[in-house]
Each structure stands twice: as structure tokens, then as C-alpha cells.
Curated annotation (Swiss-Prot):
It is found in: Cytoplasm. It catalyses: UDP-N-acetyl-alpha-D-muramate + NADP(+) = UDP-N-acetyl-3-O-(1-carboxyvinyl)-alpha-D-glucosamine + NADPH + H(+). GO terms for cellular component: cytosol. Its cofactor is FAD. Its EC number is 1.3.1.98. This is UDP-N-acetylenolpyruvoylglucosamine reductase. It is an enzyme of class 1 (oxidoreductase). One of its GO terms (molecular function) is UDP-N-acetylmuramate dehydrogenase activity.
Amino acid sequence: MTGHATVWGVRISRVVPGRAVTGDEVRELLSGTGATVREAVRLAELTTLRVGGPAVLAECGTTEALVATVRALDAAGVPVLLLAGGSNLLVGDDGFDGVVVRVATSGVELGADGVLAEAGADWDAVVAATVAAGLGGLECLSGIPGSAGATPVQNVGAYGVEVAELLRRVRLLDRATGEIRWAGPGELGFGYRTSVLKHSDAAVVLAVEFALRPDGSSAPLRYRELAAALAADEGESRPAAAVREAVLRLRASKGMVLDPADHDTWSAGSFFTNPVVPADRIEQVRAAIHAHVGEVTIPTYPAADGVKLSAGWLIERAGFGKGWPGAEAPARLSTKHTLALTNRGTARAADVVALARTVRDGVAERFGIRLEPEPVTVGVRL
């Protein structure tokens, strides 16, 4: 049986259940594709959370190799997990029974008013290159770990800017037909931290292109904390280079810039998305919060479908402070930012899952709001 299905939120192929594929089988299948195959690779080595069991890995350093590899695996009905930066991924301790296709492409082309990046290009390196070239627009997305190809999948956003606002087009491999085509933002169903690419396995991102500001000015500053750091009013612009520096400082202060020596950065970034409460429920939610923590000012933000609340604020007010549950725990909240679930060096995926469940359920019990995880999960259920 061949075709595609989504299991545990990950794009994989549908196959008859059976044993895991072996490295030798994959090498034979992928001979001539240009992929490099390794077996028994611990996925903990390839994810920023540093957890995850073993898998067969096929590394693709060119777009041609990536396309040929996915086509061959799909044709053979072998389950596929696409992996690039590994920054938004939680893999179970048993690993993955199919083939992990690592997207290791890295090309970046700068133009007069935009940038084209291959899917595997390091995202922050792409942002840095645009700023250095005098192009504005992406600077608020500085310091976000991961790959360029993942940004439209998640509709990555930070400090008031989302990928959907700047994306010109995305190059896709259609897995049903094997064809390659370009798609515009109107086809991608963008929403808050989501797109049709996140919830469908129908396409593989090969490259992304962004429309940028050729005068080197930033996108309008919409995030109060960032505007204050730049001594600017909300809605104003500043030089992209200055905004990038300010964003990197703010992210580093919250443990959101990768540093191998700092366990506060051994995370998937923000683990939960900020919940959007329907307008007709917001007063009920306010009452629940006030009943638990008293008459406090609740940070709220306008959203298309209601009112957006701060997940980090809710987590802390529910009793889960920075560093919870304590120094002895293998997985705990960051000591800098309650929205990051971190591996303190010895955590397994099961430890991260247990922490996520406890925090999610605690917030739901106290405030009646269910937090939704942002990372893709493989082989675990939250």
C-alpha cells in the first residue's frame, strides 16, 4: 500500500505495519539519489531538545538529492520523517521506524528586494545575510533556531512579525504527482503558527523566497518590549541591523538563542502557543483567572478570532514558575522563560512529555484554557 498519511502530526508515508527498515535496505533503495545513508542514528543528536531514539538517516545535501530521495521512499511505501534544524521537534525514546530524511541544503541568493533560500539553510544565517545586505523585514525573526524551509510550515513569528507577511512564494515537491511547483502565500492557509503545510503531508518545501525592504529599514515595530529597547514608538521603523541586535539581546535574556553550554537553551523554543480565546468566552476566562490569582491585570492582545492571551503568563500564574519543578528534575521549565521546556542534560523524551502534560493540565484545571503544543511530535502523545 502506498500513499500519504499524517500520524502524530508528522508527514509520513502510509505503509502496512511491519518491521523497521534496515540501513542496507535503504542504501539499496536510495542508490543513485545522492543521499548519504547512516543507521542507528540517535535523533537526540539532531534536535535542539536533545531527546529522541534511533533511526535510519538519509542526508540530502542538494535539492536534487532531496527530491529523488523522497520520490524513491514514497514509491516504496517507506515512512518518511523530514528533518532539518530539529528545533521544533519532539521525538520519542523509541525513535522512528522509517527513514529520517535530513534536509541539508544550504543555498542562499540575495536580490535587490528579497532573498531566496533553500529549505535546509540555517534560518538565522539567512536573516543575518539579509540584514548585512541592507534588506529589511526579517530582523524581528533573528535568533530563531531551525531551517528556512520550516518557517512557512509553522508560519514562524516573533516580536510582532510573521512569515506570512513577507513570504513571496515557496517551492514545493508535490508528493502525490512527484511534480515541483511554486506556490504563493494565498495557497498556504496561513494562521497563527500554522499553515496547510503543517497539517498535510502532501508537499515537501524545497525553497522559500521573501519580499524585503530595499532601504534597509525594519518592519514596523509592533512589540512593546522591542520598541522600548530601541527607544521607539510602536509602529515606527528603525534600521534593520539595530533591530536585529536588540532582538538577539532580548532572546538571549530569555534563553531563546541556542548555546550548547546553557541548558536553558536545550529546548524546542516556546513549547505552547499563545491561546486565542473566543470573544464570547473571554469574560468567563477573566473570572476564572481572577478567582485563582486575584484582581490582576491580564495581558491580552487582539486576534482575528478573539483575544490572545500569553501562555507564559498563564503558566506562571498557574503555579509553574521559572525552573519548575526544581534543580533535580531532568526536564524542567527554563530558569529564564516559563514557556520553554528544557532538557537539563539527562532528560529522555518521556521526561519532557510528563512535564508538558503536568503544565498543560494545571493551566486547564485552574483557568479552563487548554494550551496547545507548538512542536511537531513523533512517537509520543501529549
